[in-house]
Amino acid sequence: MNRYFPKTQIWVLAATLIGIYILTSCVKQEEFSDIPEISARQFTLIFDTGQYAVRGILAFNFQDGDGDIGLNPGDTFAPYNRAGNYYYNLVIRYFEKQDSGYAEVVLDPPFSARIPVLNPDYPGKTIRGYIADTLTMDPTPSFDTIRFEYFIYDRALSKSNVLTTPDIVLKR
């Protein structure tokens, strides 16, 4: 007989460890499509002392089955080169509400952004979370109502679903 652990304590410890193993091995990892999916969270306007918004924060949820969302700073060769369609992996299109409805306004530089690699330590693993991107607004817009369309690309160039914000009124 072991003088530090009586037999009954060893059996209880062994049964506890086996029980913990069984319970944790039964937990299923969430499975998502390898094509990224996004869902709206919110759009927040930030005003300074003037009557028009100076910044907006676009926030949305995302999920991806193989976790390949994000670009490294060195990802600048094709297909991620500046002249290509995949330089920005968060694509944001800007629309102004004009007399005849919404019209897209192409900006230079665009509101689009490069999301950094989100899952560097666990490549190939399911990932989900939310992204918030701060956008600098025109302090003297020609039209006071706008909206955005946005989507993301993963590293495999899979395009997520496209979302549209509700009308955003820039004036207080």
Which sequence ranges carry the predicted segments?
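First exposed extracellular module after export/assembly in secreted or surface-exposed proteins
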Residues: 36-172
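Bacterial signal peptide processing site
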Residues: 27-30
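C-terminal motif of bacterial Sec signal peptides marking the signal peptidase cleavage site
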Residues: 22-25
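Bacterial N-terminal signal peptides that target proteins for export
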Residues: 2-12
